Amino acid sequence: MKRWIMVLPLAVFLLVAVFLYRGLYLDPAELPSAMIGKPFPHFSLPAVEGESTLTQADLLGKPALVNVWGTWCVSCRVEHPVLNKLAEQGVRIYGVNYKDDNAAALKWLKDFHNPYQLNIRDEQGTLGLDLGVYGAPETFLIDAKGIIRHKFVGVVDETVWREQLAPLYQGLIDEGRP
């Protein structure tokens, strides 16, 4: 019995060390999403601009990025110029203005330009909840049928676009070509 008391702390230490060692090789930016491979959630929410109501059907037809953003999000301000540049290059981007005041969102888009073909107002965060959003910015890649193919958590900068999202986006574009 005395021997077990002496060995137990060593065994616990080794077990904890193995888990910590394994954690060194995990990517903290890579958060698994249960939504990958599933249709974009059904929603009926107002547009940020204008009086129209948008639904998931408005997102169908072509591959697109769906960017979750907010005026309160400092990182969103960092990625916004990259999104503007991508939109100028013809990349289809839809916005989800997450848990934000609509007047603030309109001012933001006026001040920093609007890269979004459609911009969904999600003031209560219901769509964000259905998407499994942890915060902002988060960007989803959807195919022409509205299936979520990829989720990226964090700032989409030029490196992230070039190395991660652009190849996936281009692959979806190529799938749709005859």
Regions found by a protein language model. Name each.
Residues 43-65:
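A short beta-strand-turn-helix
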Residues 71-78, 138:
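C-type cytochrome heme c attachment motif
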